[in-house]
Amino acid sequence: MNLNYTSPVPQMPTQRSTSFFIEDILLHKPKPLREVFPSPFSNSIASRMPLLEYGYPLMPTPILAPHPHHPLHKPEHHPYFFTSGMQMPALFQHHPELPGKHCRRRKARTVFSDSQLSGLEKRFEIQRYLSTPERVELATALSLSETQVKTWFQNRRMKHKKQLRKTQDDQKTPNDVDRSLENTSESEMHEKNTDGKNGMSPDRYTLDDNEDDVDIEDDICSPEHLL
């Protein structure tokens, strides 16, 4: 009788080693889904939707709704991410120091009435250069701003010089042209010297020769002097 008895060694189930082959990756099956039974307090469709193993619903959430968090992870609030109750990112939040409406500044063309143009022309015939107090006085009388009066006189003087040049170019005698230029320069210098003696400084600026109209750089958000 043979007493050499060896008990059979139980065979352990062989586990397939994890591999990165495409066949092994495709063989992995997703975890089974469990169905959530309807709650007595809710009859919505979302409550009967299948959930993943950790409780995330397979239902698309709104874009601006807060993202569901795992119970083990607390939601972190970051100023650049969407937060609960906000419809816009915190990056574009309103700053109290900034005005609600931003007024865009642009060049607005001023339209003068006939009475205003008549008053400006009459004053220009008498005096081509105005001091600051004279501009304020004329602007108040014509219901205009000081800037409008100043700009109109600037453009009007430039237009007057163009007219003189055109008249001088049409003349046939070169000596007459030179004589007219000298008279115009002497007249302007005399007016500037007279204003300087009275403590008034004439306006000095550079204008475009092609600009005959009046352009006022003003704030279009304020209804002041809109004609």
Curated annotation (Swiss-Prot):
Pfam families: Homeodomain. Keywords: Activator, DNA-binding, Homeobox, Nucleus, Transcription, Transcription regulation. Residues 157-227 are annotated as: Disordered. Residues 103-163 bind DNA. It is found in: Nucleus. GO terms for biological process: brain development; cell differentiation; pineal gland development; regulation of transcription by RNA polymerase II; stem cell population maintenance. PROSITE patterns: HOMEOBOX_1, HOMEOBOX_2. One of its GO terms (cellular component) is nucleus. One of its GO terms (molecular function) is DNA-binding transcription factor activity, RNA polymerase II-specific. Residues 208-221 have a biased composition (Acidic residues). Belongs to the distal-less homeobox family. DNA binding protein that function as transcriptional activator. May play a role in the determination and function of cell types in the brain. This is Brain-specific homeobox protein homolog.
